[in-house]
Regions:
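C-terminal "cap" of GNAT-fold acetyltransferases
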Residues: 143, 147-152, 160, 166-187
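Conserved N-terminal entry element of GNAT/NAT acetyltransferase domains
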Residues: 1-24
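Glycine-rich phosphate-binding loop
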Residues: 124
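Hydrophobic pocket/interface hotspot
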Residues: 26, 58
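Conserved acyl-donor/pantetheine-binding loop and adjacent beta-alpha core of acyl/acetyltransferases
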Residues: 64, 71, 77-121, 131, ...
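Conserved GNAT-fold acetyl-CoA-binding loop/helix
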Residues: 31-57
């Protein structure tokens, strides 16, 4: 596990909101990111079982205008976002019902679906997206944030001051499970 270093004052890549037209590129990036960056923490079988139901594109984040993309020369090299809805994780099709809106006065916002191209890992992309998400969360009136972090993502969120609430396993198909860490922060 590498240590997290401070991000440069200005990131060399622009961040923008994701659009429906980005879905195909995101669908290519996510498995690439997960297979490379999660492999020190999860077995290949766990990774393959999690692609889609746990690790996948959630178009609701795009429709809500809460999902950000980092680009370099027009290529998506990272993505991540936040949600004002109940779900803590999962891609399209992982929920059987409408994902209800949260109340900023009572509920915690969710940080969701961070993925970075393996060739661009550990260069500050996740930190840049996280800082943008936290500002948007504050601007939307939320004062607390929940995350269900992968074991690989836990150091990034700890760097930002998120505290471990609990460790648990997400049940998946074929009697597989994925260990994760629920984390929380007051912003």
């Amino acid at each position: 596990m590498s240590s997290i270093s401070p991000m440069p004052r200005t990131a060399p890549w622009p961040l923008r909101l994701a659009h429906e037209a980005d879905v195909s590129a995101l669908e290519a990036l996510i498995p690439l990111s997960v297979r490379a960056l999660q492999s020190p923490y999860y077995s290949q079988a766990q990774i393959e079982a999690a692609l889609g139901p746990v690790f996948g594109v959630d178009r609701q984040l795009i429709r809500d205008g809460t999902y950000f993309i980092a680009e370099q020369d027009g290529v998506i090299i990272g993505c991540g976002g936040w949600s004002k809805r109940r779900a803590l994780y999962g891609g399209d099709g992982s929920r059987e019902h409408e994902d209800e809106l949260l109340d900023p006065q009572r509920d915690a916002a969710r940080v969701r679906a961070f993925f970075v191209h393996p060739d661009w890992a550990r260069r500050g992309i996740g930190r840049s997206i996280m800082a943008t998400c936290e500002q948007a969360i504050r601007d939307s009136g939320f004062r607390t944030v929940d995350i269900v972090a992968t074991l690989a993502g836990e150091p990034l969120y700890a760097f930002f001051g998120y505290a471990v609430v609990e460790r648990y396993d997400i049940a998946m198909a074929s009697d597989m499970s994925l260990p994760v860490v629920k984390m929380n922060k007051r912003i």
